[in-house]
Design a protein with these regions (language model features):
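Solvent-exposed loop/turn and edge beta-strand elements of beta-rich ligand-binding domains
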Residues: 2-527
Length: 527
């Protein structure tokens, strides 16, 4: 019989999601003493189900008999009986329809497999079956002992066994990444990675405490997406905590925006495509963006890019300096087309947000601490008009000579002495810039350099030299400078000794001039 000729050449080849090496067979009828199937050493376990046995002629199975694990919903199956022509014709029909997906084709084939029966063989970790007769076999990926959770199960595989074969799985899993955007408040310029991908979405940024930080989550759908009838897709987001367990970011659910291949997706009253979860979470997550069934979005396909953008406010729990404030995500996804609810997840991906501090020491000309001063620090924010200066809250450290301003990022600043020490001259506003360099694309981005420089004009980078910022520890992210006040000059007052001296000196000079004048006239008269 030649009913399975096209099943061999089209259906079974198309359905396979495992590539298997098959030696070229000589023409003619073969039965053989049996062949083996070997499992890869990948932590997975495979059950082998025998559907048909028979002989091979010209690369096709003939004289088909029901196998050990066969069934037929329309009649009783007895191992070794001839397979009815109607069954073979049904299989050939589905193989000829190229519009059928792999899952649809498998739905027809699995009608003839009794999964309640004991598999003819189970193999794992490089093991091989014993000699199996020529026939059609279904291979089921049933279990995994992998500690790597970024793993998936293969769909059922159907194979004509007419040689020794080794299973070579081609499993597809999604990819995921997290990014952050870095915007300079004072210039309005967004950092771009010009050396790599020319993207504004990078792995590190710096922000002021109180700023809204823009984040991006991205997931790419796996290549075997069409083999699933239901597909779970969940972004898990975890924010760094301080020593008391409080988050350094405040997530803003109302800023969440979802796109699929660049097109925004919005929940409606009748269709809720995703859920923003902030309660009832596990594993220390702060929130989740859950697509319980991605199939609800009809435009999604294998390779689709799902992007979630949101803002979170950097709060007063933030870590100052090189340690930074980490924000981590991973993607949970369906990983077994034959078992709903089975999921894997991608490795964690982390971005870091840095913030810094300036410390102002009030001193006299001899660098001794000087009490009696008060300072206001402001930052310049560019907007659609001419920009504006916004005050920065001083840290209450209990000192009257050391002024700390924490939670700063790069930009233009103005330091104003609002009260000067008694007996000392006041100083004018001091303008300075903070500049920082951090790794833009890295699995563990770090702070490279941090400096602050006084400027002679507001919001320019022209350097002056009246104050100098230093950092005693490059890791702590603190920039320190001394601001010096000098005592006022002593000026003469009316009625004081200074006035008397002036009078005496004046009289002496007048008398002296008169004597010289008289003497000169007499000398001229004598001539």
């Amino acid at each position: 019989m030649k009913h399975l000729r096209k099943i061999v050449s089209i259906l079974l080849t198309a359905i396979m999601v495992l590539a298997m090496c098959i030696p070229v067979m000589a023409d003619g009828v073969t039965g053989g003493n049996g062949y083996t199937i070997t499992a890869p050493d990948n932590g997975h376990t495979y059950d082998i189900y025998q559907i048909f046995t028979g002989e091979v002629s010209g690369g096709n199975l003939i004289k088909e008999k029901w196998g050990e694990n066969a069934k037929n919903v329309n009649s009783t199956v007895k191992k070794g009986d001839t397979v009815p022509s109607g069954v073979l014709q049904a299989l050939e029909a589905v193989s000829q329809e190229i519009t059928h997906t792999d899952s649809e084709q498998l739905n027809v084939i699995t009608k003839y497999v009794d999964f309640n029966s004991s598999a003819i063989a189970t193999i794992t970790g490089g093991q091989s079956t014993g000699a199996l007769p020529v026939g059609y076999y279904l291979i089921k990926d049933v279990a995994s002992t992998n500690t790597n959770n970024n793993d998936a199960f293969s769909i059922y595989m159907v194979k004509l066994l007419n040689s020794n074969i080794t299973i070579q799985p081609k499993v597809s899993v999604p990819t995921a990444e997290k990014k952050v955007k870095d915007v300079n408040d004072s210039t309005g310029i967004t950092t771009v990675d010009n050396q790599n991908s020319n993207t504004e979405w990078i792995d590190s940024a710096d922000y002021d405490i109180g700023d809204d930080v823009p984040f991006q989550l991205k997931g790419t759908v796996a290549a075997d997406y069409d083999r699933y009838t239901k597909y779970k897709f969940v972004f898990h987001d975890k924010q760094q905590k301080d020593q008391n367990g409080a988050s350094v970011f405040n997530f803003k659910p109302d800023t969440v925006k979802v796109t699929v291949d660049g097109q925004e997706v919005k929940n409606t009253e009748t269709n809720k495509y995703y859920n923003v979860k902030t309660t009832g979470l596990s594993d220390g997550d702060d929130f989740e963006i859950e697509f319980s069934n991605l199939k609800q979005i009809s435009s999604v396909h294998a390779g689709s890019v799902i992007i979630v953008e949101y803002n979170a406010t950097l709060n007063s729990n933030a870590v100052i300096g090189k340690g930074g404030n980490k924000n981590t995500m991973h993607l949970e996804y369906s990983n077994n087309p034959e078992q709903e609810g089975s999921t894997g997840h991608t490795p964690d991906d982390t971005v870091i947000v840095f913030t810094y501090q300036t410390t102002i020491n009030k001193v006299d000309k001899d660098k001794n601490p000087l009490e009696g001063a008060e300072f206001t620090l402001e930052k310049f924010y560019k907007n659609e008009s001419n920009g504006e200066w916004r005050s920065i809250t001083k840290v209450n450290n209990g000192s009257s000579t050391v002024f700390e301003f924490a939670g700063l990022d790069d930009g233009y600043y103005r330091l104003t002495e609002t009260t000067h020490p008694e007996g000392y001259n006041p100083i004018g506003p001091i303008y300075f810039t903070i500049t920082a360099e951090h790794e833009l694309l890295s699995d563990n981005p770090g702070l490279i350099s941090l400096r602050a420089t006084e400027t002679t004009e507001q919001h320019t980078n022209k350097e002056a030299g009246s104050i100098t910022f230093t950092s005693t520890n490059e890791d702590d992210g603190i920039l320190t400078t001394n601001v010096v006040n000098k005592k006022g000059s002593l000026l003469p007052e009316t009625g004081g000794i200074g006035t008397t001296i002036f009078y005496i000196v004046g009289v002496v000079l007048v008398l002296g001039a008169g004597v010289l004048l008289v003497t000169k006239k007499r000398m001229n008269a004598d001539k």
